[in-house]
Amino acid sequence: MEKWVIAAKRADFNQIGQQFHIDPVIARLIRNRDVIGEDKIREYLSGTVQELPSPWLMKDMEKAVDILEKKISQKAKIRIIGDYDIDGVTSTYILMKGLARIGADVDTYIPDRVADGYGIHAHLIERAETDRIDTIVTCDNGIAAAAEIQMAKDKGMTVIITDHHEVPYREEKGERRMVLPPADAVLNPKQYDCPYPNKNLCGAVVAFKYIAALYERFGVPAEELEDYYELAAIATVGDVMDLQGENRILVKEGLYRLKNTKNQGLQELIRANSLEDAKITAYHIGFVLGPCINASGRLDTAARSLALLNAKTKEEAARLAGDLTALNQSRKALTEKGKEEAIRIIETTELKNDRVLVVYLPDCHESLAGIIAGRVREKYHRPAFVLTGGETSAKGSGRSIESYSMYEELVKCADLMIQFGGHPMAAGLSIEEKNIEEFRRRLNVNCTLTDEELRPKIVIDVPMPVSYITKELVEQISLLEPFGKGNTKPVFAQKNLRVLDHSIIGKNKNVVKLKLLDPQGISVEGIYFGEAEDFVNFIREKDSVSVTYYPEINRFRGRESLQIIIQNYC
């Protein structure tokens, strides 16, 4: 059973409201997102990309720019090695387009998920040597590839790493010491001694910062960076970064530009998903457009997503957008099948008693492991790993909960794995099949999660009577967008609503439409998306219902009315 708690953060909400011309409820929502102080509130409400930190603050930026300035003047061959997910594809595109603009002799290689695996491997170094590549620039990978980088150095190549993943470390006398690869320059804000203020950039934004510094060095007008904002937004949301500070400003700007994008591929992807007349939000990136870009790297080759971004004609872009949208539909069906199998295994074995779930699906496509792990995590509110079969070993992904640092727990099991990497909330690994059971056992032995930490928590921003909702308040709530990780959609709550009427609607009969009455006698329309039958059975047995909700303006056939979207009930 979920635990409902009220965010009890304090501030003078009336004073903040008066100073910034916002409702005190909005001031409370901002405080609940840990935005504190006049400067931070002003940045949150009206920050612009012109105020973002200089790329030159990033450790090794000067060195990385100096290297490519020299290499470009020497007409040296440069290869970008990216990654097959949405962040890797957009990073590759940003670097490729940016370097070409300043005259670089540049090509790209995005590893195949199955044939190559994640990141830079020995055979990619050998291929670069065969192709007479002088300089390798990685994006969204490389920070954990010390051996491969050393191999490239031994062959006389120059290597620049741009990455955002956790920096490998070793424990020495109770202290963590970074284990950096021997690259010529490393751009990663997570380096302990990197002064760049935002440690939570995605790979594409690290790449964007590099291009911004290079453009400045080469005298390219700053306005030419504007085409990259939409890609930074797509990657930031698609790679599930916190929408706070710089990230939120970049996504806000990127969404604004995306609706009028000049990129043929993105135009056609928007059209293929029937969004050409929609107000595109972070939700559309996270759950519609982003999964299409990711789908090619999961089920085919990510080169198709890169080709979409590179498309020069409407016809080519439309064909690729259609292909990626169809691939995503296939991915959805395979994901559902894998999720159902994972749940069946958990429910029928001793796994159901584990605090950290490790599910082995030998016949599942390896690219779906992360998505299925996320679905399992959502259902059980426990850290979840899903492993899939491979030719020589199992591969998999993990998705975590806030109180469990997945990467740190993997470090404790490093001897059992062939390779691993990731973040506190997500990780990837490869492991010999014979070690899976010991991996599961050790993760659970090491696990210190309490029953309270494993109980899902619904944090209510404001207990607010529905009678307080106005069109003006709903419009002010939109100032808090874009919503996502780290800047969640507000949660309001109302007790004791009477259900005057209800009906199940929708093509799949999974939507409940309601007419509700609050204790003050104010009526409001409500909508519930979810297990419609369970909800209807609940309200039939009760005189009233308490709900968490989000208010909206329902626009239909030229008419506007207020309604609440019911999120949880009891």
Can you describe what each PLM-predicted range is?
Residues 70, 74, 316-360, 412-570:
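Mid-to-C-terminal polyanion-binding domains and interfaces
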Residues 164-165, 365, 423, 511:
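Histidine-centered active-site/metal-ligand motif
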Residues 1-3, 479:
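Catalytic domains of riboflavin
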Residues 112, 188-190, 388, 570:
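Residues at the C-termini of beta-strands that transition into short coil/loop
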Residues 177-178, 183-186, 392-400, 523-526, ...:
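Short, well-ordered strand-loop elements centered on a beta-strand within folded domains, enriched
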Residues 6-135, 155-156, 173-176, 182, ...:
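Hydrophobic helix-and-loop "lid/oligomerization" segment in the mid-to-C-terminal part
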Residues 126-204, 208-217, 227, 244:
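Active-site cavity-forming subdomains of large catalytic enzyme subunits
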Residues 147-151, 357, 372, 476:
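A short acidic, amphipathic alpha-helical/loop segment
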